[in-house]
């Protein structure tokens, strides 16, 4: 049985980390694509040379032409300009929108049946643009956002309670930015909801609010620490979880930026919500109940995403005709 082919568009920090993780998990053969000559080839060779030590079998190829991604089962897009200190995700919009148009055309021509995961920021607008540019079914194009944001929330909670991260579940919905919505009500430790843990004296509401704020600013915190780039280990791990659920038909319930067409009262936009990912792509959108402040925060987040999408429409009106 032939191995799946996984194409990585962009061979920077996230792209290289993705390639290595795919090898370690033996998810398939890897094609690293980048416009910079030598970079994808060098990283592919370096990772391939680690395979005898790490004990995995996979082929790694570096390329500067989209032809190399032909027939890929999964395409993960990291191409674009990374966020720098003091730069908001919104600042990246016009630059990375052009990148998504080029990438979308390449995927449409060479890997039209792939499951596509977008990581490029500003995420919710970029995955929307990528889907429009590629013309692919919306259920086969998703954005990596909620898995990462939820992982950060889970880690902070596990650290606060001094428990295993495996016993912490958490959901972060909405846009992948400052307006994201960490849902305390639906987050648990070994099945015990966070509000109950406050009542039990494990933490205070004020401390919980601080953790929620830290989650919202998780990406910026790392950008400010690194000073020369942005996070790549956790984003790569998050995208791998999504790709694995698709390739192995695991049907995991994961929060991702998914195309909404009426769900949650949202139309023609990508927003972070829980979905089931299986062999058909997004197989189900899970609509959970939100009320009060949670619903207000979600609606505010949707409004922020709408603003980015509207900006995309002004910059590239031709996307709407695709």
UniProtKB/Swiss-Prot annotation:
Catalyzes the reversible oxidation of malate to oxaloacetate. It catalyses: (S)-malate + NAD(+) = oxaloacetate + NADH + H(+). Belongs to the LDH/MDH superfamily. MDH type 3 family. CDD domains: LDH-like_MDH. Gene3D superfamilies: Lactate dehydrogenase/glycoside hydrolase, family 4, C-terminal (3.90.110.10), NAD(P)-binding Rossmann-like Domain (3.40.50.720). InterPro entries: L-lactate/malate_DH, Lactate/malate_DH_C, Lactate/malate_DH_N, Lactate_DH/Glyco_Ohase_4_C, Malate_DH_type3, NAD(P)-bd_dom_sf. The keyword NAD applies. It comes from Rhodopseudomonas palustris (strain HaA2). Its EC number is 1.1.1.37. This is Malate dehydrogenase. Keywords: NAD, Oxidoreductase, Tricarboxylic acid cycle.
């Amino acid at each position: 049985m032939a191995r799946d082919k996984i194409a990585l568009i962009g061979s920077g920090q996230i792209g290289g980390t993705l390639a290595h993780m795919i090898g370690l998990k033996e998810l398939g053969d890897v094609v690293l694509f980048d416009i910079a000559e030598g970079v994808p080839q060098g990283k592919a060779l370096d990772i391939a040379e680690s395979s005898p030590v790490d004990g995995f079998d996979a082929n790694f190829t570096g390329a500067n032409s989209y032809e190399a991604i032909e027939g890929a089962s999964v395409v993960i897009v990291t191409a674009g300009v990374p966020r720098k200190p003091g730069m908001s995700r919104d600042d990246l919009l016009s630059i990375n929108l052009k990148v998504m148009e080029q990438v979308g055309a390449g995927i449409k021509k060479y890997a039209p049946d792939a499951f596509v995961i977008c990581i490029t920021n500003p995420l919710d607008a970029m995955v929307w643009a990528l889907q429009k540019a590629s013309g692919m079914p919306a259920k086969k194009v998703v954005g990596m956002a909620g898995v990462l944001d939820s992982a950060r929330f889970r880690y902070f909670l596990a650290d606060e309670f001094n428990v295993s991260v495996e016993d912490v579940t958490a959901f972060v919905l909405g846009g992948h930015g400052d307006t994201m919505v960490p849902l305390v009500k639906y987050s648990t430790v070994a099945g015990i909801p966070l509000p109950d843990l406050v009542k039990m004296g494990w933490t205070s509401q004020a401390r919980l609010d601080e953790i929620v704020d830290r989650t919202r600013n998780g990406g910026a915190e790392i950008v400010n620490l690194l000073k020369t780039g942005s996070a790549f280990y956790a984003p790569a791990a998050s995208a791998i979880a999504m790709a694995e659920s698709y390739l192995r038909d695991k049907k995991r319930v994961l929060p991702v930026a998914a195309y909404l067409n009426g769900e949650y009262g949202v139309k023609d936009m990508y927003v972070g919500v829980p979905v089931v990912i299986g062999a058909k792509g997004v197989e189900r959108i899970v609509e959970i109940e939100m009320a009060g402040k949670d619903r207000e925060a979600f609606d505010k987040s949707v409004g922020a995403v709408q603003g980015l999408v509207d900006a995309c429409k002004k910059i590239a009106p031709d996307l709407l005709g695709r």
